[in-house]
A protein has these predicted regions:
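Exposed low-complexity, polar/acidic, P/S/T/G-rich flexible segments that act as propeptides
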Residues: 164-215
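Conserved small/polar residues in nucleotide/adenosyl-binding loops
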Residues: 350-353
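Beta-strand-rich interaction/scaffold domains
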Residues: 56-131, 284-332
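A short beta-strand-loop element at or near the start of a globular domain
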Residues: 1-54, 62, 118, 131-144, ...
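Long, contiguous, structured domain-core segments that constitute the functional module of a protein
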Residues: 204-344
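Coil residues (strongly favoring Ser/Thr
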Residues: 58, 109-110, 186, 202, ...
Length: 353
């Protein structure tokens, strides 16, 4: 993940020295001081990886590490799954590690079954890391804080470094910066007393939340067993669909033969069917058959994804399984006439793709 989209949920303004609270709570917050050793705030920083679902074994022990990026990703550049994360972080920039399972058994069944429950993997930055980032945040100009945030914090790299057989489908990454402050009168600024203990000032939690959104770059690194992939590619009896990284499956359409047979006639309908072979793997957890398959002309494959285009029936055609398709044995593109006609326009060229 790189620079985050942001949403304000409070403010980071407080004096922490003399706040009298439970020591267990106070220990979770880091004092932030300026260059003159004066306290300018306090904070607790948590990072959450929310996921909508998962694949594989729900109880496989896994671990991830989160690193701070040392430079921003270029918003004008397209990043592919062969991106090298080491170009953007150092081992010393570790923010934290977390062991987890896809199903968190520390959460009660009654909570996990709620419609509002969303599972997550979270880490809390230690005192040293929270202090380093907190100093940047508290010294920032409050008026342009959100604009300045990407320059203060370039983003994170999440690395899976232990366990296999489980994939989390991350839907959102969130960083919460929480602090404790006195509750004051909005007009006079005088500290308000606690309703529980009138001898103590009232305190509250406040903070800001920074979310990853679709508008910012979320680049994924995928690596494959090259020898195993090559064996699949070398198979002459069938091919595999393995995307977005793995096997670049190509289909050749007889456009020249179609053009020769037409001889000026109009092409009304073209149907393409690609047979599906049954999976014979005996693995306990196997990925389900793809329900959506994109057929795209080779010449457009880079621009299609880099420009975030949608299937238009001309440069590409999308197969989507419907509820009426009970037994999926073939990917059927019922009408790719527009795509073929677009190819026919270039039939005079020496090579078609």
């Amino acid at each position: 993940e790189n620079e985050a989209g942001t949403k304000a949920t409070g403010s980071l303004v407080t004096s922490f020295d003399n706040i009298e609270i439970d020591s267990k709570i106070k220990d979770r917050f880091t004092l932030i001081k300026d260059e003159n050793n004066h306290v300018i705030g306090n904070c607790q920083i948590n990072i959450y990886l929310w996921y909508s679902s998962y694949f594989g074994d729900s109880l496989t022990a896994c671990r991830l590490s989160i690193y701070e990026l040392n430079k921003r990703l270029n918003e004008e550049e397209a990043y592919y799954t062969n991106i090298n994360p080491e170009d953007y972080y150092k081992q010393s920039d570790l923010l934290g590690t977390k062991a987890y399972t896809a199903v968190d058994l520390s959460v009660s069944d009654s909570i996990r079954k709620l419609d509002t429950y969303v599972p997550s993997v979270s880490i809390r930055l230690d005192q040293a890391k929270a202090k380093k980032l907190g100093q940047k945040l508290f010294k920032a100009d409050r008026k342009d804080f959100y604009k300045a945030f990407p320059d203060l914090f370039s983003g994170i790299y999440v690395k899976s470094d232990y366990g296999d057989g489980t994939v989390l489908y991350i839907s959102q990454v969130q960083m919460d910066v929480v602090s404790i402050e006195y509750v004051t009168d909005s007009i006079t600024g005088i500290k308000l007393k606690s309703k529980v203990n009138a001898e103590k000032d009232s305190i509250q939690y406040t903070g800001r939340t920074f979310n990853s959104t679709r508008e910012i770059i979320q680049a994924n690194r995928l690596a494959n067993d090259t020898e195993a992939i090559q064996k699949c590619i070398d198979n002459s009896d069938w091919t595999y669909l393995k995307s977005p990284a793995g096997i670049f499956t190509q289909v050749t359409l007889p456009v020249r033969q179609i053009a020769e047979k037409l001889e000026g006639d109009t092409l009304n309908a073209v149907k393409l069917g690609i047979p599906i072979y049954n999976e014979t793997s005996d693995k306990k957890f196997g990925m389900s058959m793809p329900r959506n398959v994109l057929l795209i002309r080779k010449k457009y494959k880079e621009s299609f994804f880099e420009n975030n285009q949608l299937s238009d029936g001309v440069t590409s055609s999308l197969f989507t399984q419907t509820s009426s398709t009970t037994n999926l044995t073939e990917y059927t593109y019922n009408n790719i006439t527009k795509l073929i006609n677009d190819c026919l326009k270039a039939v005079s060229y020496t090579h078609l793709t």
